[in-house]
Amino acid sequence: MVRASAGTEKTVIAINLLAELTNRMQFVQYVSKNAAPRTVYQFKLKGHLRKNSVDNLFKGSGSYTEAPRNSVGTLLADEAHRLNEKSGMFQNIGENQIKEIIHAAACSVFFIDESQRVTLSDIGSGAEIEKGAALEKSEIIKMQLVSQFRCNGSDGYLAWLDQALEIRETANYDLDGIDYDIRICDSPAEMESIVVQKNRARNRARILAGYCWNWPKATRNNTNFHDIEIGDYSISWNLNGGDAFAISEESIHEAGCIHTSQGLEFDYTGVIIGDDMRFENGKVITDYTKRAKTDNSLKGIKTLAKKDKEKVEQIADEIIKNTYRTLMTRGMKGCYVYCTDAALAQYFKKLLKQK
């Protein structure tokens, strides 16, 4: 179990392990809940290897519901905090993805960052991995990655962000001396203009947004339909399912969400913070009722709220803040933010000493 916060290059290590162990003739697979990173790596490799060979290196986390014990040499579970209990489209297959991965592999490696759990169905935690290991009678070795490579190598930016989003108390009340370009934009058009300009160098800048706008099935491949509307500004959610969002040159004029960006990194990102987070009475407030109806990350929360409203609001608050923390840490060199809530924008500007 490898604990690693955002930017510690856990995915780079996982991919290098995949290459090294494959070179040693071991049967090894890279596993993730999120399809987006797998799609990117498959796309990059398919010019060099046969399609079947590449596809067999990368698997979804629900691939091991019936796998025999130790049938794989090593499974590298990236973004293990995103693992679910059940598998399948309707989450009704299998028993527990953590236990199934441990069962299927002689050696399983879980890369985990609990602060990136972003849906109600995410069960990946240190406690759950230990529980799965105990059930499978497996030895567990714990490690931690501490060096920060994203956000210009600045742990200070991550600590500042935790303080700003009121995720946890840190000593980082400002970004003095930290080499990271973060700006609050006065309009989404201004934010998009900066990101498009930054993208010209290497096709490594993207716009991301909180899931506060619906993504209707009927228009998901319609380039002329703009799902996100803010005043006279509009933009489409990522097209074609969004799995190639990070590498398709056309996607610079689309907005990605947590599901198409988690596990990936860019040089620069533009982030639209929607109505699910605002600043009110001196506090950063979240509101899960402002999430889009097509967003499944909080599916079932209204039913849970009838049983324990206070606990549900606490869980939703954590998920929403984790989501924006994740979106705001995808950029290695900079992040440009637009907030639909004017008070939240002013709050961030004050923290950044931005006029």
Predicted regions span which residues?
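Hydrophobic anchor at the beta1->P-loop junction of P-loop NTPases
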Residues: V2
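The conserved Walker
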Residues: A6
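Conserved lysine of the Walker
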Residues: K10-T11
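Conserved helicase/translocase motor-coupling segment
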Residues: A14, T119-G124, E136-A159, E166-I285
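AAA+/P-loop NTPase substrate/partner-engagement loops
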Residues: N23-R50, G60-P68
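Conserved RecA-like ASCE ATPase "motif II neighborhood" in helicase/translocase motors
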Residues: G47-A104, H253-G256, T323
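Signature of the SF2 helicase/ATPase Hel1-core->accessory helical subdomain module
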Residues: L76-L145
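C-terminal accessory regions
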Residues: V109, E254-K355
